[in-house]
Amino acid sequence: MYIAILKCESMGRCKHNGEVSIFGVRPASFPNFPFHLMDKIGGFVILDELWLRRWCEIIEYPMRIPTLYVPIEDYGIPTVEDMDLIVDFIKYHVSKEKEVVVSCIGGHGRTGTVLAVWAGLNGIKNPIEYVRERYCECAVETEEQEEFVIEYLKMKKRG
């Protein structure tokens, strides 16, 4: 996992430091949180249980930034209900003209899945490609994650 991050960053392909914003959502990996952008941030979505304790000590309690914890197993997918919760959290903060940082440990699979869903909900026709081109070609790592993005967006289109 960390080898993939180093490989991507060293070759200039990934932007795990929060510099990319996809419709108000900034992806960041564990070691690269965009602390320099704190004035723009309205909330954080943390997709990994390992973050919980340390994150509370660093950001959530002292800085009072709303944080949504949705623990998803590494290389896994959220439930539909969890994705709905994530989307609602993002919509709320973006509607207040704030951005949301989404992060897991590596910043590829789980983070990429959320980014692709968000891009699709914002009208992008090929959201997985879009996220891979703008953020990281390693985003949305597994077939299961790709299928989740496609099926979730189909379900939301049907209403």
Swiss-Prot record:
Gene Ontology cellular-component annotations: cytoplasm
GO molecular function: protein tyrosine phosphatase activity
Disulfide bonds: none
Stored InterPro entries: Prot-tyrosine_phosphatase-like, PTP, Tyr_Pase_dom
Protein name stated in the entry: Uncharacterized protein MJ0215
Name of a matching Pfam family: Tc-R-P
PANTHER family in alphabetical order: TYROSINE SPECIFIC PROTEIN PHOSPHATASE AND DUAL SPECIFICITY PROTEIN PHOSPHATASE
Organism, scientific name: Methanocaldococcus jannaschii (strain ATCC 43067 / DSM 2661 / JAL-1 / JCM 10045 / NBRC 100440)
Family annotation (SUPFAM superfamilies): (Phosphotyrosine protein) phosphatases II (SSF52799)
Domain of life per record: Archaea
Family statement: To M.jannaschii MJECL20.
